């Protein structure tokens, strides 16, 4: 009986030792946390080497150097498609009785597409997702120009293809413009273009058009001989104001010594100002420099029907003289205002 009791005691003692030491046949289950880059294009996924038991607290790791081109990291999720439970970096959760895989959650980047119309009408910007295409906007407009497409740089070398080009960053597209008219083209009033303003449309005009040869006058005086009207200029862009100044003087003058009262409507500037052709009535006598451009860009090229004689400009030189130009050789000289020369009207638009 004593021997049997001893055996039982020994068994119980061994059992107790096993229980105390944890060396029992049944072990406690453990679980792992795995991080998945979910389509990342660079960097390495973080590694959690901790062995967890059910109900342990898990702290969510940072993404480290994990990246995906065109996307921004937005935390972790229990499903690859992002439909599961979100877990922010640094947050915690209680692990259950299973391994857990956390998938990187990526938010697609969006970019701003800005349209620089380079002097044309405004075009609204667009927001486009990474890899997306830009919607072609309505063409802008610019006075004096024809729209010629959108380009990737202000110099307009590489065109943007709305059908194939995609957006991968914030970009600016630039409008390209081509002049509606080139030198020696026929203008809207039927004359020839003899000047295209280098800086483009400004101050209400971009082109100078010479009236057709059929409108030219011969044997016309400048007027105001013996009187300095003053205020006229010689530069490009001054012909119209010159003409207005001269016509105003002719209309207010009462001295008919040289016939400027009775013959005012037959003076060079007055004739140009009164011209109406194909609905256009904005003609004027060209300034000295404008007259030279007409000789240089039309007469020298053999177009425009110009004679080789002297033509009047609207630029006054003195009380007795005004500037004219010999169209046979281009020479510019001041001449007596009561001399009779040819007159060709021009317009700016």
What are these regions (language model features)?
Residues 41-55, 84-91, 121-134, 158-166, ...:
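Short, polar loop/linker segments at the starts of domains and inter-domain junctions
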Residues 74, 148-149, 178-179, 198, ...:
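C-terminal, surface-exposed recognition/capping segments
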Residues 3, 25-179:
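Secondary-structure capping and domain/repeat boundary segments
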Residues 23-27, 109, 176-278, 328, ...:
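Short, compositionally biased
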Residues 39, 80, 119, 212-214, ...:
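Short, flexible loop/turn elements at secondary-structure junctions
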Residues 31, 72, 100, 111, ...:
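Residues that flank catalytic or metal-binding motifs in active/ligand-binding sites
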Residues 1-26:
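Sec-dependent, cleavable N-terminal signal peptides
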């Amino acid at each position: 009986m004593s021997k049997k009791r001893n055996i039982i005691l020994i068994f119980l003692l061994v059992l107790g030792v096993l229980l105390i030491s944890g060396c029992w046949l049944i072990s406690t289950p453990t679980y792992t946390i795995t991080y998945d880059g979910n389509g990342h294009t660079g960097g390495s996924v973080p590694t959690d080497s901790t062995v967890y038991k059910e109900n342990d607290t898990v702290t969510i790791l940072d993404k480290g150097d994990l990246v995906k081109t065109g996307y921004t990291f937005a935390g972790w999720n229990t499903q690859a498609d992002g439909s599961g439970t979100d877990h922010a970096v640094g947050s915690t959760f209680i692990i259950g009785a299973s391994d857990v895989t956390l998938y990187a959650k990526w938010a697609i980047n969006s970019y701003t597409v800005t349209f620089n119309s380079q002097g044309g009408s405004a075009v609204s910007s667009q927001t486009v997702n990474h890899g997306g295409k830009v919607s072609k906007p309505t063409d802008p407009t610019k006075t004096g120009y024809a729209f010629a497409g959108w380009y990737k740089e202000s110099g307009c070398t590489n065109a943007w293809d709305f059908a194939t080009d995609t957006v991968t960053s914030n970009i600016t597209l630039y409008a390209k413009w081509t002049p509606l008219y080139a030198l020696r083209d026929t203008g809207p009033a039927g004359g020839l273009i003899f000047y295209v303003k280098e800086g483009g449309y400004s101050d209400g005009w971009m082109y100078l058009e010479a009236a057709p040869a059929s409108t030219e006058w011969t044997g016309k005086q400048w007027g105001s001989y013996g009187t300095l009207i003053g205020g006229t200029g010689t530069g490009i862009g001054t012909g119209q104001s010159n003409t207005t100044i001269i016509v105003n003087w002719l209309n207010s003058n009462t001295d008919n010594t040289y016939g400027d009262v009775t013959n005012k409507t037959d003076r060079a500037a007055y004739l140009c100002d009164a011209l109406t052709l194909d609905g256009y009535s904005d003609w004027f006598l060209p300034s000295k420099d404008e007259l030279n451009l007409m000789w240089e860009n039309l007469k020298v090229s053999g177009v425009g029907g110009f004679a080789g004689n002297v033509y009047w400009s609207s630029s006054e030189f003195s009380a007795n003289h005004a500037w004219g130009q010999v169209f046979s050789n281009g020479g510019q000289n001041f001449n007596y205002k009561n001399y009779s020369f040819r007159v060709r009207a021009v317009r700016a638009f």
